[in-house]
Amino acid sequence: MQVSVEATQGLERRLTISVPAEQIEKLVKDSLQREAKRARIPGFRPGKVPITVINKRYGAAIRQDIMGEVMQRNFIEAIIAEKLNPAGAPTFVPGSTDGEKFEFIATFEIYPEVELKGLDAIEVEQPKAEVTDADVDTMIETLRKQHATFAAVEREAADGDKVKMNFVGSVDGEEFEGGKADDFELQLGSGRMIPGFETGILGHKAGEEFVIDVNFPEEYHAENLKGKAAKFAITLTEVQAANLPEVNDEFAALFGISEGGLEALKAEIRKNMNRELEQALKANVKEQVINGLLANNDITLPKALIDGEVNVLRQQAMQRFGNQTANMPELPAELFTEQAARRVKIGLLLGEVIKTNELKAEDERVQGLIASMASAYEDPSEVVAYYNSNKELMQNMRNVALEEQAVEALLKSAKVTEKEVAFEEFMNKATGRA
């Protein structure tokens, strides 16, 4: 086998590989003989079909298969010999056969050489937060509201009330599609409607008819309504006040607490809040570290890896549509290219961090991650056992652990400052509610 390597552009490489023709002819001959032994052709005894007949019937297909196998096998031998690391599947183009040799070309991309830079320039503001008694009380108040019952009242509508109404919306005096509803229910303060709609109902009583002026946001989904001033003619038919359950042992029982009553509920709430806080703190620091790593390291990305990631993201997006995908056209790659490129770059950079620091997934950390995730389920031990018995899930958890270890390794050289922050403020920002 003879090999020549050509760097065409960027990460693309072109291998020209020559293989002795006699090697291919021997493989073709051997394959024809094997086929002759098992072929069943009318007019010939089993195993006695002449090679010429087999060659006439199956020769072209057999030769094509052999050529494919030869190209694949010799390509692998060539990249090992040349110490090349392909980033995707090669494209094979068969060349000439002059009787002495068979030549073919393999084109592919290689992984870029990654040299980590600016690790000591990464800046991280590490938030410090804890769950206080007041935070637990706030959560209990939220749970009370979620379990509220409503009853009609004869007073002005206030924040937190549930109202029923009929309304008609218009822009420039003309009703618009989707702007009319009867017996519409709305909890004031829920933020379901456009700005100004809910506040415009405050202070009105059942039976009143009134008009409120609002403006559709510039980012509103309907193109014909973006940024437009609108009027809503409203007839308020009912105002319902919330009746919140008392905070006692009976309240705790609503959440499956059979022993320990209210104190047990508070302990469970605190545990869940602490778990969510820990996850959010980790995610916050990780995002800062990753952003710093990306900003300080510019690398050329293999198109093959980006294309592969685009396909993954596209499939995930289609799965979210569920049964609605049957008649949907394929989502364009452009929707996912930027995110795919970011994910590929992160993977390459973190891979180099793992390699440089000789990191291996710590078993204790892996089990800790599984236990933390399982604690959110009714039977944690069952979830832990399931993960430990599933090779694919275990590999996923090892990858998560390795990523955590890589981030921790980067933190050691980063410029880290700590900042005290209240639980509610931090979690609101983390969940996008701020």
Curated annotation (Swiss-Prot):
Q: Which InterPro entries match?
A: PPIase_dom_sf, PPIase_FKBP_dom, Trig_fac, Trigger_fac_C, Trigger_fac_C_sf, Trigger_fac_ribosome-bd_bac, Trigger_fac_ribosome-bd_sf, Trigger_fact/SurA_dom_sf
Q: Where in the cell is it found?
A: Cytoplasm
Q: Which reaction does it catalyse?
A: [protein]-peptidylproline (omega=180) = [protein]-peptidylproline (omega=0)
Classify the source by domain of life: Bacteria
Give the enzyme class: isomerase
Q: Membrane-crossing residues? A: none
Please provide, alphabetically and separated by semicolons, the GO molecular function terms listed in this UniProt record: peptidyl-prolyl cis-trans isomerase activity; protein folding chaperone; ribosome binding
Q: What is its EC number?
A: 5.2.1.8
Query: What keywords are annotated for this sequence in UniProt?
Result: Cell cycle, Cell division, Chaperone, Cytoplasm, Isomerase, Rotamase
A matching Pfam family: Trigger_N
Q: Which PANTHER family match?
A: TRIGGER FACTOR CHAPERONE AND PEPTIDYL-PROLYL CIS/TRANS ISOMERASE, TRIGGER FACTOR-LIKE PROTEIN TIG, CHLOROPLASTIC
* Family annotation (HAMAP family): Trigger_factor_Tig
Q: What is this protein called?
A: Trigger factor
Please name the source species: Shewanella baltica (strain OS185)
Its lineage reads: Bacteria, Pseudomonadati, Pseudomonadota, Gammaproteobacteria, Alteromonadales
